[in-house]
């Protein structure tokens, strides 16, 4: 596959010059965002609003800079993300919106609506065929994201405890999956009922098409018929009390490959453009209710029409940086018995790996790992 262009600029701004937000706008224009036909189109800007308590996510100002360019080109932008499969402040649309607003993503601040992609309970999804999929035949994608005419991803590039790093493919693939879609990527297992949390309301049973959930008259709790449960994850969104769990038992390589296939399902057949900011590179996901200190210095802003080339370029730039000594990565590198894997992300989270994601993404035609870095 031919190489793709990835555009890059750093965060330096001279006194009395353009702001760094203007610098981002100039970068995405130079990369060719204006070549996309956005006039009158619904444009989904896929990003992460940050978990409650976390402050390493991208500031709303970055989103506003992109929103203003989309509007200038005649588009109708909205910010979007889908609900999480685990307990927290983003597992349903009401709490998710409150969390986004608390973190500054209000319509007044960002200049457009914020729409939770998979609806109130995370069950409003569309099954999208994965062309060439080896792990997923039909991806479960939030309906609002699939209804959009154009996809723009805005990604905080950072470390991740499972996938090594969180980049464009994770933002789109995992982030656009409904609660059931996220479960499919994380696990091949069956539902488990946490009895102490179950209220016996039976709402979950209405969502199960396979008689996998049974009400136990003696305990007045729901139970799982493991012979019937197919692990679809639909029951996750039905429970308001976090009583249903799925163990994250999928191999990391399988998870990575599924993320790539979910990303392909989202992007196939639609115009898309992708932006990544290597800033506040925290060691773990922005899904945490806390964030540790950055593991490397800030690097810059990148964008491309190719999501895979963009992730590869971000990785390569990060690996050239000197680790910050007072960080999780620094701690690991000083630990007794440390084994150097010659990779910041693998040294940061030794149980993680990411090459399987990049390799599989290229195999299924998501993009190219070969790129030309255009600096400016």
Regions inferred by a protein language model and the residue ranges of each:
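Extended, low-polarity segments enriched in aliphatic/aromatic residues
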Residues: 2-54, 58-62, 69, 73-81, ...
């Amino acid at each position: 596959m031919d190489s793709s262009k990835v555009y890059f600029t750093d965060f330096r701004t001279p006194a009395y010059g353009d702001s760094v937000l203007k610098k981002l706008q100039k970068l995405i224009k130079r990369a060719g965002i204006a070549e996309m036909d956005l006039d009158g189109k619904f444009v989904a800007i896929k990003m992460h609003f940050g978990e409650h308590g976390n402050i390493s996510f991208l500031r709303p100002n970055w989103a506003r800079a992109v929103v203003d360019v989309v509007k200038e080109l005649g588009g109708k932008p909205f910010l979007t993300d889908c609900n999480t499969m685990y307990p927290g402040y983003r597992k349903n649309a009401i709490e998710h919106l409150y969390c986004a607003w608390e973190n500054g993503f209000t319509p007044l601040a960002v200049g457009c609506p914020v729409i939770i992609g998979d609806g109130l309970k995370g069950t409003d999804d569309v099954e999208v065929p994965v062309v060439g999929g080896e792990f997923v035949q039909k991806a479960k994608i939030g309906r609002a994201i699939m209804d959009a005419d154009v996809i723009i991803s805005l990604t905080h590039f950072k470390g991740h405890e499972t996938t090594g790093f969180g980049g464009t493919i994770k933002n789109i693939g995992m982030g656009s999956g409904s609660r059931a879609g996220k479960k499919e990527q994380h696990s091949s297992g069956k539902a488990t009922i946490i009895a102490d949390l179950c209220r016996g309301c039976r709402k979950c049973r209405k969502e199960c098409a396979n008689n996998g959930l049974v009400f136990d008259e003696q305990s007045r709790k729901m139970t799982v018929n493991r012979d019937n449960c197919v692990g679809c994850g639909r029951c996750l969104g039905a429970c308001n009390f976090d009583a249903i769990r799925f163990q994250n038992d999928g191999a990391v390589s399988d998870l990575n490959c599924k993320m790539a296939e979910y990303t392909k399902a989202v992007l196939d057949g639609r115009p898309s453009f992708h932006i990544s900011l290597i800033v506040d590179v925290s060691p773990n996901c922005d899904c945490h209710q806390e964030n540790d200190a950055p593991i490397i210095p800030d690097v810059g802003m990148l964008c491309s029409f190719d999501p895979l080339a963009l992730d590869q370029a971000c990785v390569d730039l990060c690996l050239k940086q000197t680790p910050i000594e007072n960080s999780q990565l620094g701690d690991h590198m000083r630990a007794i018995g440390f084994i150097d894997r010659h990779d910041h992300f693998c040294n940061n989270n030794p149980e993680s790996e990411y090459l399987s994601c990049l390799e599989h993404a290229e195999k299924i035609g998501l993009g190219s790992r070969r790129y030309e870095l255009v600096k400016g």
